[in-house]
């Protein structure tokens, strides 16, 4: 039953991709890229749930857990530009807390099977394991599959497997929707030391 529900949710979330030129029509818990976070959360809640993950402060990460309107995910993470007083969302993740890396990767593989036909026609990057740049030890990993839309925006399905000695981060499965600009920041700039 849970698998059927997940398939239906993923189909609903991603059904517009084949018709859309960008990702603003895709939603996670009713929230889209380009929406103001203030339409869903109070300024106080946003500020209270803001974290300081990135060395370069171009974007602000926010992690929202267990809000009443969350039906599918345990948490919703999003980012907005640091100077943006409207809190316009440039990335959004639906997060499921799956602590066991083997179970997480099984779920990831099933989601990949389920959504690949929906994302057909977009550039596909094979599933890979990468080192999480925020962990200086190099022991925290991300297993991921990506699709790149024509304008460079991305859809990713990821398992985050954090080293037990790294912070208090929780292993999780994430379905991520990102603008090209934010993805490039996250992968190339966010965890680098300022020059």
What is the predicted role of each segment?
Residues 69-83, 153-166:
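Broad, structure-driven detector of short, well-ordered beta-strand segments within folded domains
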Residues 21-61, 91-195:
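Non-cytosolic coordination micro-motifs
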Residues 4-15:
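Sec-dependent N-terminal signal peptides
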Residues 81-95:
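A basic- and aromatic-enriched beta-loop-alpha substructure that forms the phosphate/nucleotide-
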């Amino acid at each position: 039953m849970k698998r059927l529900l997940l398939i239906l949710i993923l189909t609903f979330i991603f059904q517009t991709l084949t018709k859309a030129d960008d990702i603003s029509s895709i939603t996670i818990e009713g929230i889209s890229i380009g929406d103001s976070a203030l339409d869903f959360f109070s300024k106080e809640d946003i500020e209270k749930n803001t974290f300081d993950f990135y060395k370069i402060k171009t974007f602000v990460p926010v992690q929202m857990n267990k809000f009443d309107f969350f039906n599918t995910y345990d948490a919703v993470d999003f980012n907005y530009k640091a100077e943006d007083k409207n809190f316009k969302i440039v990335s959004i993740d639906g997060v499921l807390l799956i602590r066991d890396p083997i179970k997480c990767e099984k779920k990831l593989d099933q989601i990949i099977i389920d959504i690949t036909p929906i994302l057909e026609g977009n550039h596909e990057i094979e599933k890979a394991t990468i080192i999480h740049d925020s962990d200086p030890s190099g022991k925290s990993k991300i297993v991921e599959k990506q699709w790149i839309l024509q304008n460079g925006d991305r859809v990713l399905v990821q398992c985050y497997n954090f080293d037990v000695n790294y912070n208090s981060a929780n292993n999780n499965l994430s379905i991520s929707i990102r603008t090209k600009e934010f993805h490039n920041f996250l992968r190339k700039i966010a965890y680098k030391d300022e020059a």
